[in-house]
Amino acid sequence: MRNRFRRLRCILHYTGHLLEVLGLVLLLPLVVVLVYWGRHGESWTTVNAFLISGTVSLCIGFVLRNAFACDDLDTIGSMLTCAVGWLACSAVGALPLVLGLRCSYLDAYFEAISGFTTTGITVFDGLDLMPRSILFWRALTQWLGGLGILSFFLIVTFRASSAHHIFGAESHKISATRPAPGLFNTLKILWQIYAGLTLLATIVLALAKMPVFDAICHALTALSTGGFSPHDASIDFYRATGHAHYRFIEYALTFFMMLGGINFLVHYRVLTRDFKALWDNMEIRYWWGLIVAFTLVVMIDCLRQSGSLTAVFERGTPIAAAEVERTFRYSVFQVMAILTTTGFGTMDIGSAFFGTAAKQLFLVMMVIGGCVGSTSGGFKVLRVAMLNRLMQRELFKAKVSDRASTGLVIDNHIVPDAEIHRVAALFFAWIALLVVGGGITALFSNQETLAAFSGMFSALGNIGPCYISVADMMEMPAVVKITYIIGMLAGRLEILPVLLLFSPRVWR
């Protein structure tokens, strides 16, 4: 009993620390208010929204940090701190939306946790008319959540005690191999790369004549693979409004989404001129293969859907180069947006432009996600590759001998059975949550089967787009929104911390 109370004190202590840092971050949008004062919806309402939210966060954080002393955290305590910390940050991060937009707290909380988990599902429309500071805050929540809120907390207020345990709670972001000795050095390098790529994306988009504010917001949400946009039409806004360089913008964002979906240790190796990192491990090879295969299949299905392939085979009519380029651009953009779990859109994935095969593949991509150690969500490419290798191993054993001793080898290393069991358990937990979430959506809404399950696919995979429209998502019953909130958090923290949070045995 005493140990449980000590664990609770530690959880509240570190949550207080986290809220103090978040309180300072909540003051950053005031710069946007100052820049656009009197324009784009900026007024004393938005000033008060962020001042009050920041003050509340700082005060609660100060009280929790000082009222509950803590020396060290165990592994379970760190996982619980991770889950509670993300929930607490979302609770406070929702306040500017409530105060600035006068929306319900549930919708604001949904939007905040969608931001911090880099999911990108939204229950708001009218984005083009929203105050710029609110739009910036939405983008900033995704950037903070990209490499993990707790890793950001550690880099800002580094403490040796409990740091490794807390970092381990978000270890799905970073693989075991570190670019530099020492946890703080590793975090510093990774956040420097992250910030540098974000700055590069901002510059490239600004050079393409995208408005600077839009460039900043899209850079923040592209590298974090979050997908929030300051426009209702997402990236298609630029084509629809006749932007001269909308094609370049789409290709540029495709590239930066791809960077966000790659293990950041690969970026570090490339920046240190170790270019073999781009193909010398199994996960990155699977990554390139999936991108090429999915893009080709989606592109062919779109050409078939438009009737262009039929014209080629039946009448020998060649496909115009402009149509090929357009179809390729839409296909590769949407494949990258979903596979990296970013969720930007140049075309509604439920539209008639995409055929049945493409729509089914989008669901598969939602499950796979990006690479381990990236900002992407999903089950992760490495784990999919491991399950594929495991299936091949079992087939080999059945063919040769039931007693054949064949370990699972990946990149010249034998994978321990404990890791295989963990990946298999995580996979079945994913399936269970998808079934439960899809069932709840179908039961409490009027969505058809594909749309109902796509909502939970999107939430658990931290994707964003699904076959449910924003208007329908806004009207979802509270029970469905709460289910998606749990799904978004479970997907980002890879389920175990959330299961521990709701386990009575942990708190007895």
Model-identified regions with their sequence ranges:
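Membrane-proximal intracellular helices of multi-pass ion channels
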Residues: 1-508
